[in-house]
UniProtKB/Swiss-Prot annotation:
Keywords, sorted A to Z: Coiled coil, Ligase
Protein name (database record): Putative cysteine ligase BshC
Transmembrane intervals: none
Family label: Belongs to the BshC family.
EC number: 6.-.-.-
Function field: Involved in bacillithiol (BSH) biosynthesis. May catalyze the last step of the pathway, the addition of cysteine to glucosamine malate (GlcN-Mal) to generate BSH.
Organism: Bacillus cereus (strain AH187)
Keyword Ligase: yes
GO molecular function terms attached to this record: ligase activity
Keyword Lipid metabolism: no
Gene: bshC
UniProt-listed InterPro entries: Bacillithiol_biosynth_BshC, CC_BshC, Rossmann-like_BshC
Coiled-coil segments on the chain, per record: 460-484
Length: 538
């Protein structure tokens, strides 16, 4: 593996944040400097956390996932008042979801290690699985290449239920068939059988989406010390009850903080991402297997436009009786994370960084300071055959990141022809239409009854010219079919569906190609935190 960095243009909040623009950095409580991290440690030392109860739960949960010894030791280390966490989170995508989930975890592991060394305190890596999510459409699929096209392959459970990812039971038989279908689209390699066994071992131990995700991630990062937490685990929810109560008692301050911070964002020229009603309580309650967002309505807490209604006392009583029925929304999830964990740093993707810029005054409303927010490491893998294609087409490795691949293809094709086809045909059509318009005027003078036919005649002539243009382009493309296929392969590999590779492809493809130690070898590479994109040649 060979790694290099390239500068990829970014936009909006992320670009300005990474470029050190003071206006947007003022929307965060800490700069990404060593002094700021030292200050964060001091600030965390002044707060109290329910460490013993948290450790007891994390030990039980991670042991069930058959965590390695390094993970168990890291969990136990959290009992110490001077141990902190670097944390990130993601939904429980089947087969771990897109590559960026793996890259988030790599980011967490690397930053935790670096900060432990530089700050001289114990820092452990934590990955927060968003188990409360009910949107199965976001986690029940993966993308594959089939018949020279990118296909979205959806897992259809035979017994779908409206439930969270932590509670949605997987049909193991159906899931096994789905996995087999995915692997049929991969080339068979010396690693295929081992990877399938690796996956099936995790599947057999799982009952839910979160189980399957947790077992796979734990096996993949077995010796890394990574701690996993299911945000919707009933035992964790019990520990969170005091903070749920606090949110309910301060929801107006939370909403006001969000509104005020979004006004700041607007004044700086950015468009806010978070959309909420002015009466939102920012807590979900599970009612009849449905996740219902609570709202304030005349001193009552209501859901589904008043279908469900609770007094403050009733809501608090229900939280104490059934804490597993409650979960956070996009606004309060970061607050709950801050309440539960002594967070040295939060690692997020571009979208998360943008919406966290809207939360500063929300944190302050609860009496917290927002932790340092660190953009995750971004990675693209270039296989040997794709590197060869780039070389054959005289393209730089950075070209597909800085330019639209379709545009690169068009430019290359136009350079193979003496005169641009589009321009020549446009000129011809204009000249022919001008002549035909004059001819139509002549026809109209002599026989007005033929005016309509003359117009149709113009349309047919234009159709024939366009047909000739299409046939010429088709023949030119056929002549250069070998080279154009290289562009298609580059597009599929590096910018599938016009998106970054890490947002589409799944890690299982790379495990199948390069072995079960693929992720371990990636983690050995040096990554920087300067916002540059990392390209790894395989």
């Amino acid at each position: 593996m060979e790694i290099k960095e390239i500068s990829v243009p970014q936009q909006g909040v992320v670009a300005d944040y990474m470029n050190g623009k003071k206006e947007i950095q003022s929307c965060f409580d800490y700069m990404l400097t060593e002094d700021a991290f030292k200050q964060r440690v001091q600030d965390l030392r002044e707060r109290e956390f329910f460490r013993q109860d948290l450790v007891a739960h994390l030990l039980e949960y991670n042991t069930k996932l058959q965590a390695g010894e390094a993970t168990i030791q890291n969990v136990k280390a959290l009992e110490d008042e001077d141990t902190y966490v670097v944390i990130a989170g993601q939904q429980a995508g089947l087969l771990t979801g897109p590559l960026y989930t793996i890259h988030k975890i790599i980011s967490v592991l690397q930053l935790a290690k670096e900060k432990e060394e530089s700050l001289g305190v114990k820092v452990v890596p934590v990955f927060w699985i968003a188990g409360e999510d009910h949107d199965m459409d976001e986690i029940n699929h993966t993308f594959v290449t089939k018949n020279k096209k990118i296909k979205k392959t959806i897992f259809h459970d035979r017994n779908p239920k409206k439930a969270s990812a932590s509670e949605s039971e997987l049909s193991l038989e159906d899931c096994r068939k789905w996995i087999e279908e995915i692997f049929k689209t991969y080339p068979e390699t010396n690693f295929t059988k081992d990877v399938l066994r690796f996956i099936d071992d995790s599947l057999r131990k799982s009952n839910t989406y979160v189980d399957f995700f947790g077992h796979l991630i734990m096996k993949m990062f077995m010796n890394s010390g990574l701690i996993l937490v299911d945000s919707h685990h009933p035992e964790l929810r019990k520990l969170e009850v005091p903070f749920f109560k606090q949110i309910v008692s301060k929801y107006k301050e939370v909403q006001e903080g969000l509104h005020n911070q979004q006004e700041v964002i607007k004044e700086l020229g950015y468009k806010p991402i978070i959309e909420t009603k002015s009466n939102a309580v920012h807590i979900f309650m599970e009612i009849d297997n449905e996740r219902v967002l609570l709202e304030d309505n005349q001193r009552k807490f209501v859901g589904k436009d008043g279908t469900y209604s609770f007094s403050y006392e009733e809501l608090i009583e229900e939280m104490e009786r059934s804490p597993e029925r409650f979960s956070n929304n996009v606004v309060t999830r970061p607050l709950m994370q801050e309440y539960v964990f002594p967070t040295l740093a939060f690692i997020g993707g571009p979208g998360e960084l943008a919406y966290w810029s809207e939360l500063q005054q929300v944190f302050h409303a609860i009496g917290f300071r927002m932790p340092p927010v660190v953009p995750r490491i971004t990675i693209t893998y270039i296989e040997r055959d794709i590197a060869t294609d780039l070389h054959d087409l005289q393209l730089q490795e950075s070209d597909p990141f800085l330019n639209n691949v379709d545009k690169l293809r068009e430019n290359w094709l136009s350079n193979q022809i003496e005169e641009p086809i589009d321009e020549r045909f446009e000129e011809a059509k204009k000249e022919i239409i001008d002549i035909h318009k004059s001819l139509q005027q002549f026809v109209k003078k002599i026989d007005p009854g033929l005016s309509s036919f003359a117009g149709k005649n113009e349309f047919k002539i234009n159709e024939q010219i366009e047909l000739l243009e299409r046939m010429l382009k088709r023949n030119v493309e056929k002549k250069h079919e070998v080279e154009l296929n290289k562009f298609r392969r580059i597009q599929f590999a590096i910018r599938p569906l016009g998106a970054p590779q890490e947002r589409v492809w799944n890690v299982c493809y790379y495990l199948n190609q390069f072995g079960l130690d693929f992720v371990d070898r990636v983690m050995e590479k040096p990554f920087s935190w300067d916002g540059k994109h990392h390209v790894i040649k395989l």
